[in-house]
Amino acid sequence: MDNYEFSELLKTLKNKVGNIASIIKPKNIQTRLKEIEELENSPSFWNDVKQAGIIGKEKTKITNLLKNYENAFNALNDASELFDLANSENDIETLQALFNDAPKLEDTITSLEISMLLSGENDGKNAIVSIHPGAGGTESNDWASILYRMYLRFCEREGFKVETLDFQEGEEAGLKDVSFLVKGENAYGYLKAENGIHRLVRTSPFDSAGRRHTSFSSVMVSPELDDDIEIEIEEKDIRIDYYRASGAGGQHVNKTESAVRITHFPTGIVVQCQNDRSQHKNKATAFKMLKSRLYELELMKQQDSANSSEKSEIGWGHQIRSYVLFPYQQVKDNRSGEAFSQVDNILDGDIKKMIEGVLIALKAE
C-alpha cells in the first residue's frame, strides 16, 4: 500500500461512515437512551415486567450500535489526522504503521456496517434451523451432516447455545433430517443468510469407483417467535402424528409415542420434535416451530412483493452457495460473489466473514 491507496481507502471509509450516520442518526439514539434511562428510574417501570424486558432489549441493541459507531468514527478520525501529520512530516515509519493497520481499520467499519444491518425487527431473536438432504441417498445425507457440524462449530465460535429439536439419522451415514434452536444475540440476524440450497461437489467416499458427485441440502432458518406474536393455524389445515422417538443409532427408543410431527397442508410444511420425553412438550415445541416457519414464509412473500423485478435472495428455494472439494477447493457464495479457498476452515464453522459479506451485498442491492 502507498500514500495514494491509503488516502483513497480513507475516502471510501468516510463515505461509508457518513452514510451509516445518516441512517442510524447517532443523536437520536443518544436521545432515546436518555428517555429509557428516565423510564428505568420511574418507580412504576417494573410493574409491567414484559414491557420492561422489551425496553431492556432495545437499550442493549441501540447501545451496542452507538458504541460501534463511535468506535468506527473515532478510529477513522484518528487514522486520518495521523496520516495528514505523517504525510506532512514525511514520517515513513508512521505511514507504514498506518498501512499495516489498514485491514484492522476496515474491520472496525465492517463491524459498524454489520451492527446496522442486524438492527431489524427479528435479527436479535433466536433462530430455528432445519437441514434437509436432497435426493441422492447416502451422499446427500452425509452432506447434510457436514453442514450440521459446520453450524454447530459456528455457534461454538460465536458463543451461541444450541438445543436439538429433532434428529433423524441416515440409514448408512449422515442424517435424514435435523432441526435445532440457536440461542444468542443476533442468532437469527446472522443465520438468516443461510436460508437456501447448499451444493457440494466432491469425490464421494461412498462410491467405490471414486466418481465425482454433486449433492444438495436445503437449510431453512426462521426466527423463534415471542409468545405475544399471533399466528393463526386452523385445525382443519394440519395433521398431527405421534411416533416413538429414537436416539442416534436407534438407541434409547422410547416405549411411548412422545415424538410429534405436524403437517401443514396449505404450505406443505412439515415440522417434527422429539427433544423431550414428554409428548405434551414436544407438541408445544412443534407448534412453535410451525409458527416460526409460517412467519418466515410470510416475511419472504412480503420481500418478494416489495421487490417486483427480482425475488428475494434469501429464500428456501434458491441455490445460495457451492462448496467444491474436487477437482479444486473453493467455496463460492452466489449472492456476494465472494470465493474462498479455505474450505476446511469454512466446514469447521469459520463462516462469519462469509455471512457478513452476504449481508452487506444484499443491503447494497
Curated annotation (Swiss-Prot):
Keyword Cytoplasm among record annotations: yes
Subcellular location: Cytoplasm
Domain of life: Bacteria
Residues bearing the modification N5-methylglutamine: 251
Keywords in alphabetical order: Cytoplasm, Methylation, Protein biosynthesis
Pfam family, one: RF-1
GO molecular function: translation release factor activity, codon specific
This protein's GO CC annotations: cytoplasm
PTMs per UniProt: Methylated by PrmC. Methylation increases the termination efficiency of RF2.
Gene3D superfamilies: 3.30.160.20, 3.30.70.1660, Release factor
Task performed by this protein: Peptide chain release factor 2 directs the termination of translation in response to the peptide chain termination codons UGA and UAA.
PANTHER family in the record: CLASS I PEPTIDE CHAIN RELEASE FACTOR, PEPTIDE CHAIN RELEASE FACTOR 2
Entry's family note: Belongs to the prokaryotic/mitochondrial release factor family.
This protein's name: Peptide chain release factor 2
Organism: Campylobacter jejuni subsp. doylei (strain ATCC BAA-1458 / RM4099 / 269.97)
Lineage: Bacteria, Pseudomonadati, Campylobacterota, Epsilonproteobacteria, Campylobacterales
